[in-house]
């Protein structure tokens, strides 16, 4: 069973905001005029980065109004991206205090504090009222939550009838054991990776109707190949996911890249409709 305290400890970093500011300065970004795009190398913490978020945006375009829920929002990068593109208000919830604290500061920094509001808490037991949101999504979150049926029950409770729930997670392909550490877990006890079929089964078990489910393996492989080539040419950028991953960033990224390239892991996209 994945312990939420261990998950929080895996991500918590009290110096993160200062590190992001230093990275922006190193890139000659004016801290008084920071754009959402300037933050995407560090706050779009998932395979594909901003391009990965666009898969979610394409599905959320079908929702013409209302407020969205970001389940496991992290620093709020996808929330700010989605809010800007679709002009929606977004609530986010995440376990990690520093992600929420600094995520709200980053929203203020880019002028999105009135549109994106992040709170600290468990996605399994949120403080929101039932039938509150017009859509929900989660981006690379389920790998840390083994109680997926309980999670999907809670999301269903929060959604208005017939609302969409979009999932973009790292998923298992086949039965090959995962090599750790990876970006979401230092070891197996922190990880809850499952395959696409199980995600769909759990969603349908609690009453969702799955309208789309697909693995985005080729997209992820292209992204990884481009990332590796760019790093060979440019070296490590001042602002990037290494700020979130700490001293073991290289091996975490190498392990997940290798496993996606060999086909044992892939990002999966699911669109489900609440009852």
Show where each model-derived region lies.
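N-terminal auxiliary segments of SAM/dcSAM-dependent transferases
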Residues: 1-25
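Conserved alpha-helix/loop element of class I SAM-dependent methyltransferases that forms part
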Residues: 29-32, 46-66
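Class I SAM-dependent methyltransferase SAM/SAH-binding core
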Residues: 67-125
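A short acidic, Gly/Pro-enriched loop at the edge of an enzyme's catalytic core
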Residues: 124-135
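A short SAM/SAH-binding and catalytic strip from SAM-dependent methyltransferases
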Residues: 134-147
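A short glycine-rich, Lys/Arg-flanked "PGG" loop and its adjoining helix->strand segment in the class I
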Residues: 149-164
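Short, glycine-/aromatic-enriched active-site segment of Class I SAM-dependent methyltransferases
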Residues: 170-190
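Conserved Class I S-adenosyl-L-methionine
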Residues: 212-275
